[in-house]
Amino acid sequence: MHSWVQRLLTTATTAALLLLAACCAASALDAFHVPSVQAQAHVTKINRFHKQLNGNDKVFVFLTAEYENSKNSLNQVSLWDHIIPDKDKANLQVEVKSKYPLIDQGSSLRGKKVQLVLHWHVMPKAGVMIRDRMALSEFNLPDSYTS
């Protein structure tokens, strides 16, 4: 006859294995789930962002300015970011100034072509994190700055 402690341990182990199997199944099924995202931006304005959430995840959205220089083929400066906690708050319509300023510390940005890129990371509670990006618009910075 088994003691109550052995029965409790058997029950806890079985429950843990079932939870592990459910997490593995959720992770495997995430490979077939590709979220649809729609976005449009102009230099500093995001008109529309829509993400269909399934209640299992949060979405981290950020806007970067990307440019090239002689030292690096890709430079990224984050201009704005936002966390979408649930599907009720997934439709963004914002008109904001840059949350993080684009500062030219060594005059290497003068006359450069800068492209705005919207990135998003879908972070589920269990499963694979999905990353994607969308190029939005590009512009040239001035050759000289005013003081």
Curated annotation (Swiss-Prot):
InterPro entries: SPC3. Keywords: Endoplasmic reticulum, Membrane, Signal-anchor, Transmembrane, Transmembrane helix. Disulfide bonds: none annotated. Essential component of the signal peptidase complex (SPC) which catalyzes the cleavage of N-terminal signal sequences from nascent proteins as they are translocated into the lumen of the endoplasmic reticulum. Essential for the SPC catalytic activity, possibly by stabilizing and positioning the active center of the complex close to the lumenal surface. It is a single-pass type II membrane protein. PANTHER family: MICROSOMAL SIGNAL PEPTIDASE 23 KD SUBUNIT SPC22/23, SIGNAL PEPTIDASE COMPLEX SUBUNIT 3. GO terms for cellular component: signal peptidase complex. One of its GO terms (biological process) is signal peptide processing. Residues 30-147 are lumenal. Component of the signal peptidase complex (SPC) composed of a catalytic subunit SEC11 and three accessory subunits SPCS1, SPCS2 and SPCS3. The complex induces a local thinning of the ER membrane which is used to measure the length of the signal peptide (SP) h-region of protein substrates. This ensures the selectivity of the complex towards h-regions shorter than 18-20 amino acids. Belongs to the SPCS3 family. It holds the Pfam family SPC22. The chain crosses the membrane at residues 7-29. Residues 1-6 are cytoplasmic. It is found in: Endoplasmic reticulum membrane. This is Signal peptidase complex subunit 3. Its main location: endoplasmic reticulum.
